[in-house]
UniProtKB/Swiss-Prot annotation:
A GO CC term assigned to this protein in UniProt: plasma membrane
Identification of the protein by name: Putative sugar efflux transporter DR_1322
Topology class, membrane: Multi-pass membrane protein
Highest taxon above the source species: Bacteria
Molecular function terms, GO-annotated: transmembrane transporter activity
Organism: Deinococcus radiodurans (strain ATCC 13939 / DSM 20539 / JCM 16871 / CCUG 27074 / LMG 4051 / NBRC 15346 / NCIMB 9279 / VKM B-1422 / R1)
Cellular compartments annotated: Cell membrane
Length: 389
């Protein structure tokens, strides 16, 4: 695979940059900047909306260019500038402006780097491009296993300024290997080439309507983020567990997610991506139902094994699925996939908070199960095949 090592290093450093600072952004806004809960909500909402708008625009622009690298480097440079600014700015409006103007652009680094990698792998034979992207997604997940712990250690010793300076350094280093990667030459037309094993299922016309697919992934994103936000509160407040137990369960899920992703790469024969995604959504329904029923650690451990399998499918293959549905538009496809998670996250905070306020923490997971079931139904409807006469 061309430039695989350089791209792997860039993805690892990008993952470290986002995972070092991301988990502590709300804490920084409240403790260091002095934002009120309303200001924090506005800050996070404006950031998310700006990120969706900017990344969508950049994704469309990138697909019209023969060389995507300048845009990739632009998003990484925005990350450097954003975290350099946050290491010194302590005014509410200054931090908000940094978020809307710089963090929004840096959020496009994830889809742009992966689109750049996918376009570079485009001429590899068979299903190697899809498998290579899955490996890179596993590397990004590994960075999120390591990054928050490193960020917490840096925060304890050098405060928020140290965390943000380290994140800026990771953004800068992520761009270095990309400087030495030449843009891929246009792929020659191969009308008689056979489809790869990962794309065989998508060969049957018509292609699923993107509106239904996007809606399904957005509902999945809502369920995923709602479950993630409320899980620690459910364990500690409802089941009277400890923060150490929460850390163990979350860490177990993150660790198991990576080998499951790599299993997709190493397996010789796989069901179609479409089938795996629908199966993953059904498995998510079971995952949330079991959390709702859980009374202690044994069942909670089982739920995290299921969650790891679901996240491996949806994160590892979801991006590939969008790229298959939008052939030749790698930036737009990857950006659209990424934006479903951003929008789902934005909606999840409001809905989860209101639901927990009225019904308590445990029923939140029934709502997550319902959202996952609705997402599965949408995917089932979107991918239905016309019956032959």
């Amino acid at each position: 695979m061309p430039h695989a090592l350089g791209l792997t290093l860039a993805v690892l450093l990008l993952g470290l940059a986002t995972s070092l600072a991301g988990p502590f952004m709300s804490l920084f806004a409240v403790q260091q900047v002095g934002m009120t809960p309303l200001q924090l909500g506005l800050f996070l909402t404006f950031n998310a909306l700006s990120a969706v708008l900017v990344s969508t625009r950049l994704g469309r622009w990138a697909d019209r260019r023969s060389d995507r690298k300048p845009l990739v480097l632009l998003t990484l440079a925005a990350g450097v500038l954003a975290y350099l600014a946050l290491s010194g700015v302590r005014s509410v409006y200054g931090v908000m402006a940094t978020g809307v103007l710089l963090l929004a652009v840096s959020s496009a680094a994830f889809p742009q780097v992966f689109a750049f990698a996918r376009s570079g792998f485009a001429q590899a034979p068979g299903d190697l491009p899809e498998k290579a992207v899955t490996v890179l997604r596993a590397v990004f997940s590994f960075a999120w296993v390591v990054g928050p712990g490193v960020g917490a250690a840096v925060l304890g010793r050098w405060s928020f300024s140290g965390v943000f300076l380290l994140a800026a350094l990771c953004y800068a280093l992520a761009g270095l290997p990309l400087l030495f990667i030449r843009p891929p030459a246009p792929a020659p037309a191969q009308p008689n080439s056979a489809p790869s094993p990962l794309t065989q299922e998508l060969g049957a016309p018509p292609a699923p309507p993107m509106g239904w697919v996007v809606a399904a992934f957005t509902l999945y994103g809502m369920a995923m983020h709602m479950g993630m936000v409320m899980f620690s509160l459910f364990v500690t407040e409802t089941l009277h567990g400890t923060s150490a137990q929460v850390g163990f369960l979350v860490g177990l899920c993150a660790l198991l997610e990576i080998p499951v992703m790599l299993l997709f790469v190493l397996s010789k024969r796989l069901p179609g991506v479409e089938w795996l995604i629908k199966a993953g959504l059904l498995l998510f329904v079971v995952h949330f139902a079991l959390i709702y029923l859980a009374q202690g650690m044994p069942l909670l451990i089982a739920t995290q094994v299921l969650r790891a399998a679901v996240l491996a499918v949806m994160a590892g293959l979801g991006m590939t699925y969008f790229q298959q549905l939008m052939p030749g538009r790698f930036s737009a496809a990857t950006t659209l996939y990424s934006n479903t998670s951003v929008v789902g996250s934005m909606l999840s905070g409001i809905v989860a908070g209101a639901w927990a306020q009225v019904f308590g923490y445990r029923p939140v997971f029934l709502l997550c199960a319902a959202l996952s079931l609705a997402a599965w139904g949408m995917m089932l409807w979107a991918t239905r095949r016309p019956k032959l006469a």
